């Protein structure tokens, strides 16, 4: 399995296809990343490739972190991510990982932290229907029943209620790569990806087996 790449979400735009239809796209600054460690079954119990992305200041790193990063290059990196692989023979410490690892028409899975919306109610967070808005109603945006009475005498875990909305790690699968600019390290994918502009995201090849992900028929 091929490894992925770390990048930064730049924002959204649009492209026009051959028929003149507007296609929403997301612009991603993907890499360049550096291989910082190769993990083997003998030493670590599993096989993986660790990469780093984004520059960091020395004062923000501990001595062990600094020593670990300097083994693969002179620049100190801020974000680390590892990918499980069957073998590491095709990788070496210090090797650059760029958008050239991807190709137009390929499908990718993108993970990131969704935009936080703070404390939200039932309608906004879960899409509940509101109550009557007419005169005399006291149930405009109330949740309704949250469970039974004496038995079970509690609210079951997982009950959809008001609370913090967003700000979680999520993955959007099967996004189509429409354009690649290796000079500017740009990756253009169809649709939206998690996070706000400037947030760090993880892009890896789509590995759904036996399913047609991303595109709707």
Swiss-Prot record:
Q: How does it assemble?
A: Part of the 50S ribosomal subunit. Forms a cluster with proteins L14 and L19.
Among PROSITE patterns, the record links this protein to: RIBOSOMAL_L3 (PS00474)
Question: What species is this protein from?
Answer: Prochlorococcus marinus (strain AS9601)
Keyword rRNA-binding, does the record have it?
Answer: yes
Q: Which molecular-function annotations from GO does this UniProt entry contain?
A: rRNA binding; structural constituent of ribosome
This protein is called Large ribosomal subunit protein uL3
Q: Give the family, as the similarity comment puts it.
A: Belongs to the universal ribosomal protein uL3 family.
Q: Which GO terms describe its biological process?
A: translation
- What this chain does, per the record? One of the primary rRNA binding proteins, it binds directly near the 3'-end of the 23S rRNA, where it nucleates assembly of the 50S subunit.
Alphabetically ordered keywords of this record: Ribonucleoprotein, Ribosomal protein, RNA-binding, rRNA-binding
- Which ranges are annotated Low complexity under compositional bias? 142-153
Has keyword RNA-binding?
A: yes
**Can you cite an annotated GO cellular component?**
cytosolic large ribosomal subunit
Q: Which Pfam families match?
A: Ribosomal_L3
- What are the boundaries of the signal sequence? none
Gene name as annotated? rplC
Q: What is the lineage of its organism?
A: Bacteria, Bacillati, Cyanobacteriota, Cyanophyceae, Synechococcales
Q: Where is this region: Disordered?
A: 127-162
């Amino acid at each position: 399995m091929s490894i992925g790449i770390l990048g930064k979400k730049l924002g959204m735009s649009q492209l026009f296809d051959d028929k003149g239809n507007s296609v929403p796209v997301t612009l991603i600054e993907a890499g360049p990343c550096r291989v910082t460690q190769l993990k083997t079954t003998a030493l670590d119990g599993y096989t993986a490739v660790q990469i780093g992305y984004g520059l960091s200041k020395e004062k923000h790193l501990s001595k062990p972190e600094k020593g670990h990063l300097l083994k693969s290059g002179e620049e100190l990196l801020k974000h680390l991510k590892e990918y499980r692989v069957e073998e590491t023979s095709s990788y070496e410490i210090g090797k650059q990982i760029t958008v050239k690892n991807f190709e137009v028409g390929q499908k990718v899975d993108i993970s990131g932290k969704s935009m936080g919306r703070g404390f939200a109610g039932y309608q906004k967070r879960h899409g509940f229907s509101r109550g009557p808005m007419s005169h005399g109603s006291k149930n405009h945006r109330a949740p309704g029943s949250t469970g039974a009475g004496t038995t079970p005498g509690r609210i079951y875990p997982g009950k959809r209620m008001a609370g913090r909305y967003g700000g979680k790690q999520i993955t959007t699968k099967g996004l189509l790569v429409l354009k690649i600019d290796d000079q500017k390290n740009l990756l253009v994918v169809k649709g939206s990806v998690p996070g706000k502009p400037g947030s760090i995201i993880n892009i890896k090849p789509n590995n759904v087996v036996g399913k047609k992900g991303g595109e709707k028929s």
